[in-house]
Amino acid sequence: MVGLVGGGGWRVGDDAAGGGGGGAVAAGAAAAAEAEHMRRLHSHAPGEHQCSSALVKHIKAPVHLVWSLVRSFDQPQRYKPFVSRCVVRGGDLEIGSVREVNVKTGLPATTSTERLELLDDDEHILSVKFVGGDHRLRNYSSIVTVHPESIDGRPGTLVIESFVVDVPDGNTKDETCYFVEAVIKCNLTSLAEVSERLAVQSPTSPLEQ
């Protein structure tokens, strides 16, 4: 399920592939859809001293529930376990808004200043760039997209999160990607848990997206 990139390519895993012939066909179609989403929406151009990577997550909850969490630029702690507090400067939520995030103990940082680059409710795209903080993730930029899909005949959601970031002095590209991917993987796992809990509390029909 984790994708690792050393210089600009992609390796994306599928954690919802089924077994048997029908499962293989479905998995192939899902992989093709993921590749198209990445080509269209997740194009990064990492420099010589940067790394880029992408992760995917299949969530058993309808896209509107998942997107309601992902789009919460002012409340990332709704699903991100390492965020303890978030304040948006000025209070208004719009492109260019900046948030001050406090990070829980356990990560090599306590604060992060982040700017909203894109929030598209039609295409379900969120893009954020780190512009300050006491971390080492310089020029970090991420894109998160969510896409409706069917999982076991029920409304599900494919989430893709990609990023590009400078490689800190003293670290390799693989080390940098491994660290960032570990954090994103925790976030996506939590996103799935929260979304699926909300889906149980607010059941939808099989055709609702």
Swiss-Prot record:
It holds the Pfam family Polyketide_cyc2. Disulfide bonds join C51-C177. The record marks P108, T172 as: Involved in interactions with PP2Cs. InterPro entries: Plant_def-hormone_signal (IPR050279), Polyketide_cyclase/dehydratase (IPR019587), START-like_dom_sf (IPR023393). The keyword tRNA processing does not apply. Abscisate binds at residues 80, 109-114, 136-142, 161. It is found in: Nucleus; Cytoplasm, Cytosol. It comes from the Eukaryota. A motif (Latch loop) lies at residues 135-137. Gene3D superfamilies: 3.30.530.20. Induction: Repressed by abscisic acid (ABA) and drought stress. One of its GO terms (biological process) is seed germination. The record marks P81, V180 as: Involved in ABA binding. Belongs to the PYR/PYL/RCAR abscisic acid intracellular receptor family. Plants overexpressing PYL5 exhibit abscisic acid (ABA) hypersensitive phenotypes. Plants overexpressing PYL5 exhibit tolerance to salt and drought stresses, but are hypersensitive to osmotic stress and ABA during vegetative growth. Intracellular abscisic acid (ABA) receptor that functions as a positive regulator of ABA signaling pathway. Together with ABI5, PP2C30 and SAPK2, is part of an ABA signaling unit that modulates seed germination and early seedling growth. Acts as a positive regulator of abiotic stress-responsive gene expression. Inhibits the protein phosphatases PP2C06 and PP2C09 when activated by ABA. PANTHER family: ABSCISIC ACID RECEPTOR PYL8 (PTHR31213:SF4), OS08G0374000 PROTEIN-RELATED (PTHR31213). This is Abscisic acid receptor PYL5. It comes from Oryza sativa subsp. japonica (Rice).
